[in-house]
């Protein structure tokens, strides 16, 4: 798989998905990474610590199929340090090549098959006005436990 995306768009998507990446990986090193795969509208980045999963889509031009898991922190640092412009990421068997302008590097990838499978929620979604949600959270947060 290969995709092209604007640096700022990719950096924003990484920042959101990275919030769910496990800080301690324990027995599953794949949880320290982001799964990247093509989607209908571009590229999908998924981060998970098995309790929280965040999926983000970023507009991009994609070629090919497949997915891979890149080390989240390292990938984020690389993308943030790039000059603004188009970033090209190409995945081969066990590496991701990142190119932007004259910059080129490669990262080792992990198998996407080891990444946890996500189950889609069943039933219809719910819409809540932002103000109502904010007010509800403001009322219950003081009672929430700080130990968990």
Model-flagged regions — what are they?
Residues 1-148:
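Structural preference for solvent-exposed beta-strand-turn elements
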